Design a protein with these regions (language model features):
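Transmembrane alpha-helices and adjacent helix-loop boundaries
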Residues: 1-168
Length: 169
């Protein structure tokens, strides 16, 4: 076997690997934050924003990533918003991943008993402290397997970015 061909293209593979890693890491971190925010809004039923969060989750989960990327890359420039292909890929991954992470967080939040919340309030914690120190750690522990599945899913979805001018992938 002639390994000189592999040697010749190795720098391109390295560049593609690090680009994929860069987009995936930022996309996963952004998805985690968006998912937490959206799930808290839905769980605590914040008026108007709860319905908006539900619409976001349904729209994001029920449209393919490729369609979302085409909208970001080809649709937004028609209204004057031009983003680089890397930014489009990252935003698209955050948009998609945020909805999946939100559902994971929501399942974790619903798994925590209401009694835990009441006990936190009874010992003098503020509602935010109850959420931060009592509810969130338990919800995160329950949702951890789902988070890892979502991370794997998001890394696999980076292969779609080659359709939107990320030819390095």
């Amino acid at each position: 076997m002639d390994w000189s061909i592999v040697e010749q293209y190795l720098p391109l593979y390295q560049k593609a690997f690090f680009l994929t890693l860069h987009i995936a890491v930022w996309g996963i971190l952004g998805s985690f934050l968006v998912g937490l925010l959206v799930s808290v809004i839905r769980h605590y039923r914040v008026p108007f924003f709860s319905q908006l969060a539900t619409a976001y989750i349904e729209l994001s989960r029920n449209t393919p990533l490729l369609i979302q990327l085409f909208f970001l890359y080809f649709g937004l420039p028609r209204i004057g918003i031009v983003l680089s292909s890397e930014v489009c890929a990252t935003v698209g991954l955050i948009f998609l991943g945020g909805s999946y992470m939100a559902e994971s967080f929501r399942s974790g939040l619903e798994a925590v008993s209401q009694t835990q919340h009441e006990i936190g309030l009874a010992i003098g914690l503020t509602p935010f402290q109850v959420f931060r120190y009592v509810v969130l750690p338990q919800a995160t522990a329950v949702a951890l397997p789902s988070f890892s599945a979502n991370v794997i899913f998001l890394i696999k979805e980076t292969s779609v970015f080659s359709a939107v001018a990320l030819a390095d992938l």
